Amino acid sequence: MALVAQLGQGRGGLYSYESLENLAGCEIHNTERILPEHQNLQPGNLIRLGPQGYPCFSVVSAEPGRSLVLISADIKTGMPISFFSAPEKGFSIATWQFILEPAAENATRLLVRERLVYTPDLSWVWRLTEPVAFVMERKMLLTIRRLAEAGSRIEEI
């Protein structure tokens, strides 16, 4: 879970196609090592997908070695977005969950679930972006798997 705990811009990166993320101005720099300074996530911490003004998530819960749950955050305030106070148009909210489950002796399965709710006027946006998000998230998971299997070690900085 150490690799997942450090997800985000200005942290460990997103472990995906860095050059594509940066074409979109995300300023992502992926690392292949565990960064001790990004391992202690707390509820309310912000996980950015790019610089100020880009989408971001707020940590809902973080159990080291077990789970990480994120929810969309307001790009201006960093506060979690509430579905119950949403406007009727131009609104979306996402949750992103990472769960580690024992799979076998010396093996772990990383489960990822994303949920997205949006107003009907934004349905066309998500029809365009969901396939791209799938490709990027698949690359992220493959990279996390490769790094975990290689036994990424903690390096003191």
Where are these regions (language model features)?
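A contiguous catalytic/ligand-binding core that recognizes phosphate-bearing ligands
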Residues: 37-102
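Residue-level preference for alpha-helix termini and adjacent loops
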Residues: 6, 14, 19-22, 40, ...
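Aromatic-glycine hotspot motif
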Residues: 57-63, 106, 148, 155-157
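Beta-strand/loop substructures that line and gate deep hydrophobic ligand-binding cavities in soluble
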Residues: 79-138, 142-146, 155
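Structured surface interface patches that mediate subunit assembly and partner/cofactor docking
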Residues: 19-29, 76, 115-120, 129
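Hydrophobic ligand-binding cavity/cleft-lining segments
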Residues: 1-43, 147, 154-157
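Residue-level marker of positions within ordered structural domains that often coincide
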Residues: 5, 9, 64, 105, ...
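Hydrophobic pocket/interface hotspot
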Residues: 1-4, 59, 110-112, 144
